[in-house]
Amino acid sequence: NSKYFHYIHSMKCRIILELLAILFFTGCYNREQISRLDEAEALLQNKPDSALTILQQLKSEGSQAEQARYALLYSEALDKNHIKATNDSLIRRAWEYYKHHPKDLRRQCKTLYYWGKVKLRAGDKPGALRLYLKVEEKLKDTNEPYYAGLLYSQIGEVYYDQMNYSRAYHYFREARNNFRQADNTREETKATLDMAAATFNSKDMEKAMRLYSAALDLADEHKYDKLAKASLTNLASLYVVSGKKQIPHDLLQRIELSARQD
């Protein structure tokens, strides 16, 4: 009996030790996974390629919350690296979790936003618009001008593609105002260019000229060379097609200089 008791006791000890080891290593793995997800998230804005590299080295494992976070970060990283995913299975996985967590409003909105972008790339414009308008409703309860600006830009793009230029202009203007509030001058310049394009297609040449000029001033001030060139090219084209005005001398010089640099 004593031998039997000793055997049972040693078995229990071994099982307990094995369980403790499993728990220890699982805990270490989870902490490592969370740490790597934190690292990827911190890099997403300015170094999206590095963020994507980290995420590609990880697996969608851990708790439901970790798996959802991984799916959202991966979707965001693909988008920021201009990898045009048209399959929504990954972002759907994130939504399956976040839709039950209304207190995590920021991630709910981001999930719906990136899901909308996937739908848009897949050609489902009505589906994308439905998701974007759902995000717009949710964002009313937050103070996230940068993300609101991104959202309004996307909604504007949908309406612009549908040739509804007045609605497109409305949302591009909302985007510009939010980017201005967020102090993101690059995105503000892009949104101003979008407003100008919508205005041009609405046949309001004078207003389009003012907006392209405003975009050019912003791009010059902050040395956004590509945006300055886009503003300049469109402004020159407007002067030509309007037939109303002679191109100002300083603008003509800039156009000639830009043409020579090409």
Model-derived regions, located:
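N-terminal secretory signal peptides that target proteins for export/translocation
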Residues: N1-K12
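N-terminal leader/targeting signatures
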Residues: N1, L20-A21, A168, A175
